[in-house]
Amino acid sequence: MARHDEAKAGGLFDRIGNFVVRWPLIVIGCWIAVAAALTLLLPTLQAQAAKREQAPLPPGAPSMVLQKEMSAAFQEKIETSALLLVLLTNENGLGPADEAVYRKLIENLRADTQDKISVQDFLAVPEMKELLASKDNKAWNLPITFAGDAASPETQAAFKRVAAIVKQTVAGTSLTVHLSGPIATVADLTELGEKDVRIIEIGTAVSVLIILILVYRNLVTMLVPLATIGASVVTAQGTLSGLAEFGLAVNMQAIVFMSAVMIGAGTDYAVFLISRYHDYVRHGEKSDMAVKKALMSIGKVITASAATVAVTFLAMVFTKLEVFSAVGPAIAVAITVSLLGAVTLLPAILTLTGRRGWIKPRRDLTSRMWRRSGVRIVRRSTIHLVGSLIVLVALAGCTLLIRFNYDDLKTVPQHVESVKGYEAMNRHFPMNAMTPMVLFIKSPRDLRTPGALADIEMMSREIAELPNIVMVRGLTRPNGEPLKETKVSFQAGEVGGKLDEATTLLEEHGGELDQLTGGAHQLADALAQIRNEINGAVASSSGIVNTLQAMMDLMGGDKTIRQLENASQYVGRMRALGDNLSGTVTDAEQIATWASPMVNALNSSPVCNSDPACRTSRAQLAAIVQAQDDGLLRSIRALAVTLQQTQEYQTLARTVSTLDGQLKQVVSTLKAVDGLPTKLAQMQQGANALADGSAALAAGVQELVDQVKKMGSGLNEAADFLLGIKRDADKPSMAGFNIPPQIFSRDEFKKGAQIFLSADGHAARYFVQSALNPATTEAMDQVNDILRVADSARPNTELEDATIGLAGVPTALRDIRDYYNSDMKFIVIATIVIVFLILVILLRALVAPIYLIGSVLISYLSALGIGTLVFQLILGQEMHWSLPGLSFILLVAIGADYNMLLISRIRDESPHGIRIGVIRTVGSTGGVITSAGLIFAASMFGLVGASINTMAQAGFTIGIGIVLDTFLVRTVTVPALTTMIGRANWWPSELGRDPSTPPTKADRWLRRVKGHRRKAPIPAPKPPHTKVVRNTNGHASKAATKSVPNGKPADLAEGNGEYLIDHLRRHSLPLFGYAAMPAYDVVDGVSKPNGDGAHIGKEPVDHLLGHSLPLFGLAGLPSYDRWDDTSIGEPAVGHAGSKPDAKLST
């Protein structure tokens, strides 16, 4: 055992070792108490994982934000719910008997008052039948919504009760039931996960047990790591369960993965510690001291290894996807618990079993093989390096063929009930019929306008024309096609139809148009006659007015009735006046009767409006009509009747009295109708103008009829043209779009607007159905195409200031892909930085950590390439999208573990020469690294038996990566590269300096300071080979301390003259002082079960490399100037007696 790798007194592990060795039972008791308390007081980790469903995306993902905005715009409550899809099928066709079973099922579900469920029955809502009944009439879909999260225990319990109701109702009928949907998938995954955990743990434990039997060949030694791992797993699960109570996310994937990682890592730590324990026991240490020294020497390596894995996984808490952020902290906690178990519980168990001799080391069977391997690598380092890199690069190149799978259903076994349900649904319903994408349009403008809806329709039409788009449904196209009523071509056809009807009517009523012409002429003649009568009436009326005026003058003022009595000569004239008034009023009333409709007609006549004469006549006729309506003509008629009734035998007083009343009424009316004579004159003039205008009107009517007949042929041509457009309306390019404002008030529009338009009219949503599988990369790329087309349709429209988004399964998976790419970059950078820093701290160098990081990266890519070959090219399975991230962290971290063990040992051996150090390190650590690698690989290969394909792919890829790393990278690539680089590996530390350069004063002063500050609570253990040497009779005995020329012991000489001793170590024949060189390999292969130095077998020649006086066995070696500056098998240039073909004697 190398002196530089020995247990150093002081420090954390010295104190832990003292405590554990002194009170092992207390340590074991504490572990048992903690594990039991966590198990009894907290729920199981599986129960904690079942309480919440893993969120596929973070809340700030674009698709999640869009969903919230859409729910807010349409005033839909975002409630936690779980969907169950009950698919009822009958391959012979659904009939009345099946409908009766369906109705019975609805009744039974609604009778279930224990569970809060909502059933979408298409029989109760006929409009839903188009979506829930298949076109082939062989399947009905019955969606059932549960209140609560799909993964919560309450919801899962409700699901089991509802599933029982469904199966009992359908049993014995012609219907076949399939249960699918998110809640059914979660139930299946939970059941599979629980089974997988047990199977994986048992299978992994058995495989690890077999490997431990082969490694230790001791039943107790084999069981010690398993006991430590078992206690660590129980404690870690309890710890995670407690942390889950405070919000730590855990899921079944994390649990399964954690179990495999803990078994692998915990066994590795145990193998490292037990192997070092066995080394110390072989070299004569008592069991307790061997436990303590093993912990002191290997504790820092185990801690660095665990820190690498734990910190790397803990960094995943900063990732966005929960598949990483949930697994990372769980693995970090599990690795931390494994480390605590390895440095406390395992040493305590080793202390108890070692005191009783139950874990004695067996003879090492592989050291010689690994030593020869190291010799070959050092001798031909370039060939080994190039050969190993060719293999690694070739395998890594296969990653260029990798294709990722985003469909989680493909990762679940096909025999699972929910998967069968999805397959049956895809057989009977179009792809994405139940889960279309949603195009969401939000605008500051009101979209309930013809222009805005036309722009939305234009956008929808362009989207529908994209490849692999089945249909786009929305307000303007509820069935996937624009409503025919909104097509401009349809509307033009409707106009054409009306014009065609008008043309037919014109043709059918041509004779009536001729009658209209004759009627116009007759009207003109009648109006001419009326004019003559009006002129006569006006003349009489003028006389009446004058007479009445005179009568008013005679009877008005201060005249009395007595004066009228003397005017009896007027009686005859009064009777004549009454007769004239009666005739005139009769004529005026007749004129007013027919003039009223004529005035209305002339008011709406454009011909009359443009003719001044007609307008004047129309005004006069309106005055006559107004006189009749006001009662003026009735008053005059009453006066005429009174005058006509005057009799000779009547007394003048009676007549005058009657006349007095009538005259007052007439006078009162005349006062009300002021200017009647003027109006009568105007009426006479109007009648003349009307008669003259009627002749012109008759001529205009004649011309109008002629023009209408000519229009008939033109209307017929227009009708044929518009009807032709209607016939081509089915072509989208010919259809056009127009929605009249009147349609907004229809019930059909209002009903559709509730689904596709928000209440305030500022948001709209359209459903986009794709023909692609939503979980494919093609569907994700299609999302970008849809958004690009939608965005290109916005400029210069009502939607130019609107925001457009797309929600749906492909959109969410596209977000997952984007977040995965971002998380993967973070994981790679964080892992490389963390591993590099830990290697730098451990090795105190910069060069070696750089190429060690490169080695684990190419090892990871090679493992991923092998996984691609096996699963994708051979088994035909696409790799799950989460595999590269999870496998990267674990392979890099585990590779760093073995790097730390290997390179730290080489560094400790480097003072004796890099090449000798590589040979010794490969020989001494080859078996340990191989055992640890096989154990960890076996734990990962245990995941191959998992039901979930994702875990199987991860287990195989990580397992084969560990095997590749163990047998190729750590045993060939890294040793060869280390040999070629030489002392530059350790730059800029002291070990990286040229040994021929004498130390500076500063170097010597620093060494003296370090020597004074060195603390040693216990004596530093001396190299085992200085304690045991071989006698000629084969028995072990204590060796005396050898002295250097100054007479001081070797260790003192080294401390006081380090520079001298360094040169003595590199002497080709160190006859003295070389005893200070640690060469623990002297006793390799010696078994000392009783600790008395007894051994079996003969010393191999190659073991003499570490002998203090190698007088024999080295004849086959070429001569060296310096052991660490010339590769074995390559003699120094110009050295006498060197032979190019010289070989190391084995």
From Swiss-Prot:
UniProt xrefs under Pfam families: MMPL
Name recorded for this polypeptide: Probable transport protein MmpL12
Gene3D superfamilies, alphabetized: Multidrug efflux transporter AcrB transmembrane domain
Keywords, in A-Z order: Cell membrane, Membrane, Transmembrane, Transmembrane helix, Transport
Record-linked InterPro entries: MMPL_dom, MmpL_fam, Mycobact_MmpL, SSD
Predominant location category: membrane
Lineage, broadest ranks: Bacteria, Bacillati, Actinomycetota, Actinomycetes, Mycobacteriales
Keyword check for Cell wall biogenesis/degradation: no
Subcellular location field: Cell membrane
Membrane topology term: Multi-pass membrane protein
TM regions (residue ranges): 25-45, 206-226, 254-274, 298-318, 330-350, 382-402, 826-846, 850-870, 883-903, 928-948, 949-969
PROSITE patterns according to UniProt: SSD
Family affiliation: Belongs to the resistance-nodulation-cell division (RND) (TC 2.A.6) family. MmpL subfamily.
GO CC annotations on file: cytosol; peptidoglycan-based cell wall; plasma membrane
